[in-house]
Amino acid sequence: TNPYAFLLQVYFLNRRFAMIKKAMQEDNNILDRSIYEDSIFMKMNTDQGHATEEEWNIYKSLLDNMLEELPYAAKKKSPDLMIFVDVNLETMLYRVKKRGRPFEQVDEDPSLKEYYSTLIDYYADWKDNYKSSALVTIDGNHFDFAENKDHRNQVLDKIESAMVEVGTLSQSDFDRLRSKRYEGVQAF
């Protein structure tokens, strides 16, 4: 086992709990990571032998306790909408390389390729079992919303449409945002 795996995951869990409490004080906040998916990393660490079953059980107990406290710590218990960007291994490796963080690079540590592949599997399982709120899946293999404005607009349309469906965005606000976004863009 790795003596730091459990401590690091508890640290991240605590940070995510603080972030979600703050975000849930107001409407329409976006977090790039959520407390709801945090257990993926601890479970992976446990399955790969970096953390013990006892640490996994302590972690789960702590997470469950935090989730039970969330309604009292924030005005809502769960997000209105969860956005899941689904990518395959090839896309993930491309984006990791492009991001350029040395400690994430497969060229520096070839074992990371297996780690990323396993992470994708764990996320797929998590997505299939997520029930805390509405879930919108974005095809990250098709949409490069960071670099392509047309893709970004299509993704925003999908997210904002889902926000209308769950009642966090009015249809008139959706139409106004969409109109503003496509202002000056020629339709083909």
Regions found by a protein language model. Give the residues of each.
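Conserved nucleotide-sensing/catalytic segment adjacent to the nucleotide-binding pocket
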Residues: 1-31, 39, 45, 49-51
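Generic structural signal for well-ordered alpha-helical scaffold segments
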Residues: 17, 21, 64-68, 124-127, ...
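Conserved catalytic network of the ASCE P-loop NTPase/AAA+ motor domain
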Residues: 21-24, 72-77, 128
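Short coil/turn segments at beta-strand junctions that form active-site/ligand-binding loops
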Residues: 25-28, 77-79, 133-134
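Hydrophobic/aromatic beta-strand patches that form the interior of the parallel beta-sheet core
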Residues: 29-31, 81-83, 136-138
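Conserved nucleotide-binding/hydrolysis micro-motifs of P-loop NTPases
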Residues: 35-37, 87-92, 142-144
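A glycine- and Lys/Arg-enriched "phosphate-lid" helix/loop adjacent to the NTP-binding pocket
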Residues: 41-121
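NTP-dependent small-molecule kinase module
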Residues: 97-188
